[in-house]
Structures are given as structure tokens and as C-alpha cells.
Swiss-Prot record:
<dbReference type="GO" id="GO:1900194">
    <property type="term" value="P:negative regulation of oocyte maturation"/>
</dbReference>
<keyword id="KW-0378">Hydrolase</keyword>
<dbReference type="GO" id="GO:0019933">
    <property type="term" value="P:cAMP-mediated signaling"/>
</dbReference>
<dbReference type="InterPro" id="IPR023088">
    <property type="entry name" value="PDEase"/>
</dbReference>
<feature type="region of interest" description="Disordered">
    <location>
        <begin position="1"/>
        <end position="47"/>
    </location>
</feature>
<feature type="domain" description="PDEase">
    <location>
        <begin position="426"/>
        <end position="750"/>
    </location>
</feature>
<dbReference type="InterPro" id="IPR036971">
    <property type="entry name" value="PDEase_catalytic_dom_sf"/>
</dbReference>
<dbReference type="GO" id="GO:0004115">
    <property type="term" value="F:3',5'-cyclic-AMP phosphodiesterase activity"/>
</dbReference>
<feature type="binding site">
    <location>
        <position position="656"/>
    </location>
    <ligand>
        <name>a divalent metal cation 1</name>
    </ligand>
</feature>
<dbReference type="GO" id="GO:0070374">
    <property type="term" value="P:positive regulation of ERK1 and ERK2 cascade"/>
</dbReference>
<feature type="binding site">
    <location>
        <position position="543"/>
    </location>
    <ligand>
        <name>a divalent metal cation 1</name>
    </ligand>
</feature>
<comment type="similarity">
    <text>Belongs to the cyclic nucleotide phosphodiesterase family.</text>
</comment>
<dbReference type="GO" id="GO:0046872">
    <property type="term" value="F:metal ion binding"/>
</dbReference>
<feature type="binding site">
    <location>
        <position position="506"/>
    </location>
    <ligand>
        <name>a divalent metal cation 1</name>
    </ligand>
</feature>
<protein>
    <recommendedName>
        <fullName>Probable 3',5'-cyclic phosphodiesterase pde-6</fullName>
        <ecNumber>3.1.4.17</ecNumber>
    </recommendedName>
</protein>
<dbReference type="InterPro" id="IPR035965">
    <property type="entry name" value="PAS-like_dom_sf"/>
</dbReference>
<keyword id="KW-0140">cGMP</keyword>
Length: 760
């Protein structure tokens, strides 16, 4: 037994804090308050810090503690008949079972008083295993911040106890029980007043009843273990969904967000959805498994069944990375050969390796992937084509290589964003035929060529105003409806009506497709308003003043535009530059940006330029790889605009090459139009003795269905598979494949005689 102090016949005891100043002489030795605080605060802070979960590769909830720095514990003197006693053991052996987890019962408290704090209450707390630190009012805030106690007791005799309680609440990173202490019970009126300062309980100095504090301490220690569990759930590769007894979603982890594309805030609080779980992409190699087996129901081991947990089964092949949004990190390998950006292969290998390692190597690999994803390393490498595949080779030579070394570089990517603007119908007067033709402009089967006919080749201005009004473009730009109408008429007038394909109707078609893509909820949630408007405007101007000849032709003929833009994205640079020249000229009165601030205009212009340049087919694989590296969950707020722009780049690009995915009749007619334009370019190149850009488009020998299959193989299939998976518009890829099969059937039936009068 320890020595006894003669004060009040109290039994001396070894301090639970393990401070040497208290171990032999008893608690009432004559020490200064500062010395007492120093002896108590340091071990309490150390023990409190040790109790916090720390994430490395495993999770710990609490550190070890022994009296006097050792592992043993001597007998403890019994306090004056407390209501709740604890065995005279080291505090390090007190544990609580929280489900399958063992939680250390580390109970820390701060006593805020100007005295010593010694009392029946303090004796009872210590006897019950509480580690108590006495703190002066001036030190209370810093002590609470460093120790992170479960409870704070405030002596009502100190000055401004309510303010101390507020200060303690403001600095505490954990939930803390704040209790007032007085010589006697206080009135109900004062209790209510103290409650305004987060003081929610009251005791007297001579109370021995600490059962409530022990119970709160037990719950608080359990609650403080939960962040470790949530952090582990967020790090796991398997998607997890937790529902309450009403089957309302309470929690989903980060892997669930990656798999579904749904942000956590969108799902929590919503009823569970079996359809949502069934619609999730499967891990690779699990195609034979029934959908109902993809998700495992985990029964929570409690009688009331108040929670339901669903976990996506891991891939049987062990490829844990497959649960992430598989927007084709590895390309869909076109049938024409291996088209793969080297950076995609590197990142795929790194991702596979990271799934097999833990700890520091895994983090190092993630850091390396982040660096690689943020550098301009996405220009494609065309490995090889089959010798007999002239179509793919000539598409590459004519549209990408341009008869000179192409050195495309790429900006970095990130992710995520906000919502689109609402919609309402048109106000402008139009003829009945035009109005009927515009009836379903928000549908994918919309017939823009019929609108071209009934509007006398004014499809762009007609569908443009309908789309702009639905998306409230005037509100975003701060311009009038009349001004916007004058602008779109000016843009329409500068398209070449003589071009069979690159004319104002094609611009209208791309604008309608852009609006359709933006209308997808899976897209809209990630795109901010200004980028949505920029995408619509960019679609309208993306081929402005197109001469009906490609970039390679302009280079070979040494056109002034090729010289001006140094053979880089010649037409795309010209389209957007002319659009801004026409818009900003003072005497035209069509400046739709006049109400924007300088910063707003710069941002709008940057977005439009970026989106129009993304339509350069020679940079197709660059932008595709950029989109593939994008993640749309758990991204910092400052990176969401970058992600929004990346989505819009891909969106406008897909709209520009969307003809193969249109309804079959439209698909055919658009194909005939662009082939006719290529026929004319090939004829002119041969007449002038120029290098022939794509010899396959010779009217006398061309098999049009083969050229369309080649374009789908090389460009359209992967782009649409990638984007429509993200946008949840799988029916478009289905239509593209259906058209592909029709073209394929026609290849054996096509003869050069069909090439006459393709466009009637």
C-alpha cells in the first residue's frame, strides 16, 4: 500500500498520471499551481494524443500507458465509498469492446479552476480511471486544444465561465462534454443560461456520482474511433453502401463514387436503388456473373436490423483497380491497328502495380501517376497498320500527320463541377413549317437536314436561337435577345453555302448535339454555366469560313492561313479567330460579350478557343487521352473548372464527329456530303499536281462504305464509347454500331458508279 497523508485521513495513492511528484507524498503536497499543471498536463496530453487514430497502413485506436513509466501497477487506495469503483489496475488495461474492435478506455478531463481542484469529485474521477488536468482559466483554451479531453469541468467561481465554455467549444476538434461545478446546486434559470454556452450538465464539488461521466466517456471513445473506420472504408477498393432501417442511404464510400459517377452528397439521404447498383459497370472478367450476384448484402450483427450494408464484390481475378470508372484507360483498340498513346500504357501499368503493393511504394506510384497525368504527354503513337489497310493509313496521313511531323502537346487534366441552367421555349416568330421542324430539337433523332430545307438554309440561326433561349444564354452573357439574334445571323452568313459538308447546317447539327450532350444529368452536374454557354457558342462557330478543303491542302498550297498559323491547327485557329473578330468589330453591333467584365470575357474566350481547337482531328487522340485520365470524384474545389473544360472539350469534339451515331438515314446523308467534299479536294489536288491527301477519296475508285467503316474504326468508336459511358448515353454507341454493321454489309455491293450525284 502507498503512504498515507494526514490530511482528512485520506489514503495516499500513486497518481494515475504517473508524475513522480505525486507517487509517494500523496496528492496534497505543497506545489505551486504552475508546477502541478506541468506535472499533470504533459502525460495527459501524451495519453490523449496516443488515443487518436493515426492512418498509416494499419489503424490504431490508442497507445499504451503504464504508471511510473512501467508495466506494472501497485494497489490503489480506495476513495471514500464511490458509487462506481474500478479495479486497482493500470489504465492501459482498461478496454471497451466496440463490435469487433477493442477501444482503449482513455478518459481525460480538464478541470478549470483558480484553486487546486482537490475535492470529492476529483477523487471520484481519479478513482474511476479519469486522467485529470487542473488548468487555470487563462490556460484553459490551450490545454483543451493540446489534450483533447472527453470532458471539461468549469468552476463557476472563475470569472466569465460562459465565455470560457464558448472558447473551449471553438477550439475543440472533437465533441467534448462541458460541465459546470459549484458548491451547491444551481437554479433551473441559471442552468438554462449556462446551456446557451454549451454547458450541458452541472455537478457539485462534493459529488461522488461519476457514473454518467463514465458512460459518456465510453461513448466518446467509441465515437473517436469512428474516423479511422470511415477512413479505411474510403481507402478500400470495393464500393460500399450503408442504408438505415427505412432503406435510406446513410453512407457511401469513395470507391462507390468512382464506380457510379455519383457524388456522395447526391446519394446520401436518398432511398436505396437496386437499379442503381445493377447499372454499375462490372469488373473485367465478370461478364458471365449474374447481375444479382455483383453486390453482396452484409447483415449487421445486431438484433434490430437498423442498418443494411451492400458491398460490391471484388473481381475474382484480383484486379481491384477495375472498380474505378473504366473510361478506357486502355484504348478500345480499333480494328485497324494499335492506336495507343504511350502515356496511357504507362499509366495502365502503374495502376496495375499500385493495386498489388501497399504503404509507401503505393503512394509513390500514385504520385508518379499524378505527375505523368499533369504533363503534356498525350500525343498518340500510331504503332502500325495492316499492310492492306489503306483506309486507316490514308486517314492518318491526311488528317493527322498532314505530311509533316506533328508534335502535339497536351495540357494537364483534373475534374468535377456544378449544374446547368434551366430551359424554356422560344419567343421569336417563325413559320409553321420551321416551328414543326424545331419541335424535337432536344432529341437525338432531330432531323437538322429537314430544318435546313424548310428554313431555306437558315438552320443555324433557327436552331441556334431555340437552343440559346432554352439555355438562357442571354442571361449568362447579359445581352438582349435581339443582339444575340444579330450575332448568330452574322455567324451564319460567314459560312460557305457552297460547301456540301462544312457549311452552316453542319454547325447547326453540332450545336444541337452539344445541347443534347449538356442536357444529360451525368454531364450537367460536372459542367458550370459559363462553360456550358461557351460550348454552345463554340459549336456555332467551330467551322466558320471553312473553305471546304482540309489543313493538309492549305499547307501543300502554301495558303496565307497556313503561313499565319505555322501549319498548326490552321483552320481551327482561323474559325475561332474570325468569330471573335466579327463579334468585337465596333460597327457591326453584334458584340454579345459587351456586358461581361474583363475577367469574365477572358474566361469565356479561353474556353471557346480551347473547345474549337479540340475539334482538330489531328489532335483527336490527345484530347481523348486527356479525357480518359479525368476523375470526377473527390477533387479539390479549385480543380473543378479545369475538369469542366475538359468535359466540354470532349463534348464538342464528339458533337463534331457525331454523324456516324445519328439515325441511319441522317448518317447516310451526312456521309455522302463529306465524301463529296473529299472527292472535290482529291480532284483539285490531282489537277494541280499537289500531294494527294487521301487518295482513297477518288471518285473513280472510292468505296464509300469502306471509308465510313474506317472512320468509325479509327476515330468515332472509341470516342463515343468513352464519352457515352461517362454521359450515360449508351444508346448512341448502340446506334453507331448498328450503322457500322449496315455500312459493312454495303461494302461488297458498292461500285464507283454509286459515287455520281451522292448529294442531290
Amino acid at each position: 500500500m502507498g503512504d498515507r497523508s494526514g490530511v482528512g485521513g485520506e489514503e495516499g495513492e500513486k497518481s494515475v498520471l504517473g508524475a513522480s511528484a505525486h507517487s509517494q507524498a500523496g496528492r496534497r503536497q505543497q506545489h505551486t499551481p504552475a508546477a502541478r499543471r506541468g506535472a499533470q498536463r504533459a502525460p495527459a496530453a501524451t495519453a490523449a494524443a496516443a488515443s487518436r487514430p493515426v492512418f498509416a497502413m494499419r489503424w490504431c485506436c490508442g497507445g499504451s500507458y503504464s504508471e511510473n513509466g512501467g508495466g506494472g501497477g501497485g494497489s490503489r487506495g480506495a476513495p471514500p465509498t464511490p458509487l462506481l469503483t474500478v479495479a486497482a489496475t493500470s489504465s492501459s488495461t482498461a478496454h471497451d469492446t466496440f463490435g469487433p474492435m477493442q477501444v482503449k478506455m482513455l478518459k481525460t478531463a480538464v478541470i478549470v479552476t483558480e484553486g487546486t481542484g482537490e475535492s470529492v469529485l476529483l477523487d471520484s474521477l481519479r478513482a474511476s480511471g479519469w486522467i485529470c488536468t487542473v488548468s487555470f482559466p487563462t490556460q484553459a483554451t490551450s490545454d483543451v486544444e493540446s489534450i483533447c479531453p472527453l470532458a471539461v469541468f468549469i468552476d463557476l467561481r472563475v470569472p466569465h465561465p460562459s465565455q470560457i465554455a464558448k472558447d473551449v467549444s471553438s477550439v475543440s476538434t472533437e465533441e467534448v462534454l462541458i460541465v459546470s461545478i459549484a458548491e451547491k446546486h444551481i437554479s433551473e434559470k441559471r442552468r438554462r443560461a449556462l446551456a446557451q454556452s454549451n454547458i450541458i450538465h452541472h455537478v457539485t464539488w462534493n459529488t461522488r456520482d461519476v457514473v454518467l461521466f463514465d458512460y459518456v466517456g465510453r461513448l466518446a471513445n467509441r465515437i473517436r474511433a469512428l474516423p479511422a473506420l470511415f477512413a479505411v472504408l474510403d481507402e478500400t477498393d470495393q464500393a460500399v453502401e450503408i442504408c438505415d432501417e427505412q432503406r435510406v442511404v446513410q453512407y457511401v464510400n469513395r470507391a462507390y463514387e468512382n464506380v457510379t459517377g455519383c457524388i456522395r452528397s447526391e446519394v446520401i439521404g436518398q432511398p436505396e436503388s437496386e437499379m442503381r447498383r445493377k447499372s454499375l459497370p462490372r469488373a473485367r472478367g465478370e461478364e458471365e456473373r449474374r447481375r444479382s450476384c455483383d453486390w453482396k448484402f452484409i447483415r449487421v450483427p445486431f438484433a434490430n436490423n437498423s442498418q443494411f450494408v451492400y458491398m460490391k464484390r471484388s473481381n475474382t481475378t484480383g484486379d481491384t483497380a477495375a472498380i474505378f470508372r473504366d473510361v478506357s484507360l486502355k484504348s478500345l483498340k480499333s480494328q485497324t491497328g494499335g492506336i495507343e498513346a504511350p502515356i496511357s500504357e504507362v499509366l495502365t501499368m502503374l495502376r496495375d502495380v499500385s493495386a498489388r503493393v501497399d504503404g509507401e511504394p503505393a503512394q509513390t506510384i500514385k504520385d508518379a501517376m499524378k505527375v505523368l497525368s499533369s504533363h503534356e504527354l498525350y500525343a498518340p503513337s500510331i504503332n502500325r497498320f495492316r499492310d492492306a489497310d489503306r483506309i486507316a493509313t490514308q486517314y492518318y496521313d491526311g488528317l493527322i500527320r498532314l505530311h509533316h511531323p506533328a508534335r502535339q502537346r497536351k495540357r494537364s487534366v483534373v475534374d468535377a463541377h456544378r449544374e446547368k441552367r434551366g430551359s424554356h421555349g422560344e419567343r421569336r416568330r417563325v413559320s409553321a413549317d420551321v416551328k414543326n421542324a424545331l419541335e424535337n430539337d432536344n432529341c437525338w433523332k432531330f432531323d437538322i437536314l429537314h430544318l435546313e430545307k424548310v428554313s431555306d438554309h437558315h438552320a443555324l440561326s433557327q436552331v441556334g436561337m431555340k437552343v440559346f433561349e432554352r439555355w438562357k444564354v442571354c442571361d449568362v452573357l447579359g445581352c438582349s435577345d435581339d443582339l444575340l439574334h444579330r450575332w448568330i445571323l452574322s455567324i451564319e452568313a460567314h459560312y460557305h453555302a457552297g460547301n456540301t459538308y462544312h457549311n452552316a447546317t453542319h454547325a447547326a447539327d453540332v450545336l444541337q448535339a452539344t445541347s443534347f450532350f449538356l442536357d444529360s444529368p451525368s454531364v450537367a452536374v460536372h459542367v458550370n454555366e459559363s462553360h456550358a454557354v461557351a460550348a454552345l457558342l463554340a459549336a456555332a462557330v467551330h467551322d466558320l469560313d471553312h473553305p471546304g478543303r482540309g489543313n493538309a491542302y492549305l499547307i501543300n498550297t502554301r495558303q496565307s492561313l497556313a503561313i499565319l498559323y505555322n501549319d498548326n491547327s490552321i483552320l481551327e485557329n482561323h474559325h475561332i479567330a474570325l468569330a471573335f473578330q466579327l463579334t468585337l468589330q465596333h460597327n457591326a453591333n453584334v458584340n454579345i460579350f459587351s456586358s461581361l467584365s474583363r475577367e469574365e470575357f477572358i474566361q469565356m474566350r479561353h474556353a471557346m478557343v480551347e473547345m474549337v481547337l479540340a475539334t482538330d482531328i489531328s489532335r483527336h487522340f490527345e484530347y481523348l487521352a486527356k479525357f480518359n485520365k479525368m476523375h470526377v470524384t473527390d477533387v479539390p474545389e479549385e480543380q473543378r473548372d479545369t475538369n469542366s473544360l475538359t468535359i466540354c472539350d470532349m463534348l464538342v469534339k464528339c458533337a463534331d464527329i457525331s454523324n456516324p451515331a445519328r439515325e441511319w438515314g441522317l448518317c447516310q446523308r451526312w456521309a455522302h456530303r463529306i465524301v463529296e467534299e473529299y472527292f472535290e479536294q482529291t480532284r483539285e489536288e490531282k489537277e494541280k499536281g499537289l500531294p494527294v491527301t487521301m487518295e482513297v477519296f477518288d471518285r473513280n475508285t472510292c468505296n464509300v462504305p469502306i471509308t465510313q467503316c474506317g472512320f468509325i474504326d479509327m476515330f468515332a468508336r472509341e470516342a463515343f464509347a468513352t464519352f457515352t459511358e461517362f454521359a450515360k448515353l449508351g444508346e448512341l454507341s448502340d446506334q453507331l454500331e448498328s450503322n457500322y454493321e449496315k455500312w459493312k454489309v454495303m461494302t461488297s455491293q458498292w461500285t464507283p458508279t454509286h459515287n455520281t450525284n451522292l448529294v442531290l
